[in-house]
Amino acid sequence: MTDRYAVFGNPISHSKSPFIHGQFAAPTQESLTYEAILAPVDGFEASLTAFFNAGGKGANVTVPFKEQAFALCDSISPEAKLAGAVNTLSLLADGTIRGDNTDGLGLVADLIANLGSLQDQRVLLIGAGGAARGCILPLLNAGIAQLTISNRTHTKAQLLVDIFTSVDNGAYVSKVTAVEMSELAGEFDIIINSTSASLAGELPPLPAHIITTQTVCYDMMYGASVTAFNQWALSQGAAKVIDGLGMLVGQAAKSFTLWRGIEPDTQVVLTLLRDKLMAEPK
């Protein structure tokens, strides 16, 4: 019997998830289908319920439904709890729905694939939205030394720190701080841009001095060409820049493992996806 999976969003036609999961399944002989489902903005719950009632086993969730999906879960992972959102839903044997957030896990997996280790790294996280919130715990669990969060609106960055502090057991509280962009000082080993500014060709208002010849810069956005943030980072002398395509594949791989119990080969799929992206009409 073929198991059904899907990704829900609005819009959704641009989604690369069906291609990614199809590539994950092919070498494993896993019998499954994976489709993109356009859910009405006011009809996500009904669409999801219909999918599960028709035999769906699991689903990914993207904009704008991640918070709604969180509210529908019977159980959630620690990462999802802190993120306040889920991107992966699993229908369990007892009929309940488990929610996970694999976005931050995908980011960490891609960083480790590129850098080898995150142990004792000093990380600056730009942005304080859902993408940033979902990455805090995975980054800390990876062994980083400190996490500085900075956002155009400082109160949002501080709120993110406060939310984390309220749910943390005390092990990481001293490692997480919020700093205004204009007051950023010192050196960072890794700078992560979680904002969508690059999609509009824009940049967060960051001081150039925070980038050194040792700094690795990571933009969660991606495209056929170098993103605006990564172009700026290179112009300031960054040691290395990485875009978010590997994070996309990484979070999908974590979802696939949750559903199927198999760890897919992400590097092969990332290469295929990069080639596919480069071949798309500009």
UniProtKB/Swiss-Prot annotation:
Entry annotated with the keyword rRNA processing: no
Single biological process term from Gene Ontology: aromatic amino acid family biosynthetic process
Entry binding sites for NADP(+): G127, A128, G129, G130, A131, N151, R152, T153, H154, T155, K156, M220, G244
Record-level GO cellular component terms: cytosol
Catalytic activity, reaction form: shikimate + NADP(+) = 3-dehydroshikimate + NADPH + H(+)
EC number(s) given by UniProt: 1.1.1.25
Pathway where this protein functions: Metabolic intermediate biosynthesis; chorismate biosynthesis; chorismate from D-erythrose 4-phosphate and phosphoenolpyruvate: step 4/7
A molecular function (GO) term: NADP binding
TM ranges: none
Keywords, comma-separated and alphabetical: Amino-acid biosynthesis, Aromatic amino acid biosynthesis, NADP, Oxidoreductase
UniProt cross-references to InterPro entries, sorted A to Z: Aminoacid_DH-like_N_sf, NAD(P)-bd_dom_sf, SDH_C, Shikimate_DH, Shikimate_DH-bd_N, Shikimate_DH_fam, Shikm_DH/Glu-tRNA_Rdtase
Residues annotated as the enzyme's active site: K66 (proton acceptor)
Presence of keyword S-adenosyl-L-methionine: no
SUPFAM superfamilies cross-referenced by the UniProt entry: Aminoacid dehydrogenase-like, N-terminal domain, NAD(P)-binding Rossmann-fold domains
Residues that, per the record, bind shikimate: S15, K16, S17, T62, N87, D103, Y222
Cross-referenced CDD domains: NAD_bind_Shikimate_DH (cd01065)
Oligomeric and partner information: Homodimer.
UniProt record similarity statement: Belongs to the shikimate dehydrogenase family.
Its job: Involved in the biosynthesis of the chorismate, which leads to the biosynthesis of aromatic amino acids. Catalyzes the reversible NADPH linked reduction of 3-dehydroshikimate (DHSA) to yield shikimate (SA).
PANTHER family found in the cross-reference section: BIFUNCTIONAL 3-DEHYDROQUINATE DEHYDRATASE_SHIKIMATE DEHYDROGENASE, CHLOROPLASTIC, SHIKIMATE DEHYDROGENASE
Name assigned to this protein: Shikimate dehydrogenase (NADP(+))
